[in-house]
Amino acid sequence: MDDLKAKYLGQIAEATDENALEAVRLAAVGKKGEVALKMRELGKMTPEERQVAGPALNALKDEINAALAAKKAALGDAALDERLRSEWLDVTLPTRPRRQGSIHPISQASEELTAIFAEMGFSAQEGPRVDTDWYNFDALNIPGHHPARAEMDTFYMHRAEGDDRPPHVLRTHTSPVQIRSMEKLGAPLRIICPGGVYRADYDQTHTPMFHQVEGLALDENISMANLKWVLEEFVKSFFEVDEVELRFRASHFPFTEPSAEVDIRCSWDNGQLKIGEGDDWLEILGSGMVHPKVIAAGGIDPEKYQGFAFGIGIDRLAMLKYGIPDLRAFFESDLRWLRHYGFSCLDVPTLHGGLSR
């Protein structure tokens, strides 16, 4: 017994890994190990011999199992120590920077133009995106036969048979907010109405949903000269140029009379737009003097008050200023695109600190 004990305890002590230790266990206390074979020989012994050999073999087996367990624990601790040394992590190193969100270019452009018009005394007003066709069309002097009222251009809300409520549409412009503001605030009035609008169109420069800002100024003795000054100041501030030349072209809009589309002098240098210089012209907005019928629809006397209005595509402004080639990219939720074109949430646009940085 002493020889077996010395033999296997020595082998256990010399085992360098769990595979070697398992081999010792099988040779010593496995089903075919030496201790197991000795146990089988107990049947051949006399009762007196079994009384001496049995307890001694059990004690040897227990001692070997205890040594195996202790050695296995020691090998496990050693392996863990080695793993910790090889996979050491310096907790004093700075962590990977956490990504911050960024401001979408449309939101940035909206904030910038709101700041510009606020300096000129315009307040921002909002209205429902689902509105009646009266606010969206009739109140704006858009007759029933006008092409804009066709279902191919306008999203109409579904009505069940027998539903006699007035037709509702997804607003095709933010002009309904002008009517609601006239009803609510009266005159004199200076407002802008930024927000999302909807039209049934989709290509590189059109999407079913886009953003507009429309402006309205009502007062006594307002003229096209006031409109021209406001638009010039806006364009200079938004594109951050000292001088700008605008060209007013006669046009037709049902809600203004006279009406004008406004172009801006510009040039293209290797695909880069330069505002205020060059021989090219770029259309940027529509405008005009508010039609008397529209003023009357807002509950204001058109004999006493006149006004001007303008409409600008915010998405188009953002494309021109930030060099974005495809309008559809605004709505594709591509984080890589947003990280490239997005703005810091801490850069609040002001005319004093600079609009976009």
Swiss-Prot record:
Protein name, entry field: Phenylalanine--tRNA ligase alpha subunit
Localization per record: Cytoplasm
Cofactor(s) in the UniProt record: Mg(2+)
GO molecular function terms noted in the UniProt entry: ATP binding; magnesium ion binding; phenylalanine-tRNA ligase activity; tRNA binding
GO CC annotations, alphabetized: cytoplasm
Binding site for Mg(2+): E257
Highest rank taxon of the organism: Bacteria
